[in-house]
C-alpha cells in the first residue's frame, strides 16, 4: 500500500451535522476499500484564493491514508459526485527521506578566486 494525502474543500455554510456526514462518508470509503486512515484534520473555514462556484470562503479538510490506486479512484469519484464539496486534490507521498543530519555533507576546499580587474569604459562624444 502507498501513502496518500487528500485535501478537500466544502461549502462554508454547512451545518455541523452535514460536515460530520461528509467526513463519515469519506472514512467509510477508505475503510471499505481496505485502506488505513492515518489522519483526518478539520482546518476550518478559510478565504479562497479566488472564487469557486461563487464562494469566497471554504472549509478545508486534510486526510492522510494508506491505500491503492482503486481506493484513490473511488474516493475521488465520490468527492466529485458530492455537490457540497467544491474542490479536492489527492497526491501520492514518497517514502520518508532520511534526516538531513544523517546525510554527510561533502566539504571541499576551493582556492580563493581573485577579483577580476575593473574594465575601463571609454566614452567618446562626437561634436558636430
Curated annotation (Swiss-Prot):
UniProt keyword annotation of Translocase present: no
Family affiliation: Belongs to the bacterial ribosomal protein bS6 family.
Basic and acidic residues: bias regions: 117-128
Region described as Disordered? 105-128
Note the SS bond partners.
Answer: none
* One Gene Ontology MF term: structural constituent of ribosome
- Tell me which GO cellular component terms the UniProt record holds: cytosolic small ribosomal subunit
Protein name from the UniProt record: Small ribosomal subunit protein bS6
Please give the Gene3D superfamilies that the UniProt record associates with this protein.
3.30.70.60
- Superkingdom of origin organism: Bacteria
GO annotation (BP), single: translation
Q: Which InterPro entries match?
A: Ribosomal_bS6, Ribosomal_bS6_sf, Ribosomal_S6_plastid/chlpt, Transl_elong_EF1B/ribsomal_bS6
The source organism is Geotalea daltonii (strain DSM 22248 / JCM 15807 / FRC-32)
SUPFAM superfamilies cross-referenced by the UniProt entry: Ribosomal protein S6 (SSF54995)
Key words of the record: Ribonucleoprotein, Ribosomal protein, RNA-binding, rRNA-binding
> Which Pfam family is one of those matched by this entry?
Ribosomal_S6
Which lineage ranks, top first, belong to the organism behind this chain?
Bacteria, Pseudomonadati, Thermodesulfobacteriota, Desulfuromonadia, Geobacterales
According to its UniProt entry, the function of this protein is described as: Binds together with bS18 to 16S ribosomal RNA.
Amino acid at each position: 500500500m502507498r501513502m496518500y494525502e487528500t485535501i478537500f474543500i466544502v461549502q462554508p455554510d454547512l451545518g455541523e451535522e452535514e460536515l460530520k456526514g461528509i467526513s463519515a462518508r469519506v472514512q467509510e470509503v477508505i475503510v471499505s476499500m481496505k485502506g488505513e486512515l492515518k489522519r483526518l484534520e478539520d482546518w476550518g473555514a478559510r478565504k479562497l484564493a479566488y472564487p469557486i462556484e461563487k464562494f469566497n470562503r471554504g472549509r478545508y479538510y486534510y486526510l492522510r491514508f494508506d491505500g491503492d490506486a482503486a481506493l484513490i479512484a473511488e474516493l475521488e469519484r465520490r468527492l466529485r459526485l458530492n455537490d457540497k464539496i467544491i474542490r479536492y486534490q489527492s497526491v501520492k507521498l514518497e517514502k520518508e527521506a532520511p534526516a538531513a543530519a544523517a546525510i554527510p555533507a561533502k566539504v571541499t576546499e576551493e582556492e580563493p578566486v581573485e577579483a577580476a580587474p575593473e574594465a575601463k569604459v571609454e566614452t567618446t562624444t562626437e561634436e558636430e
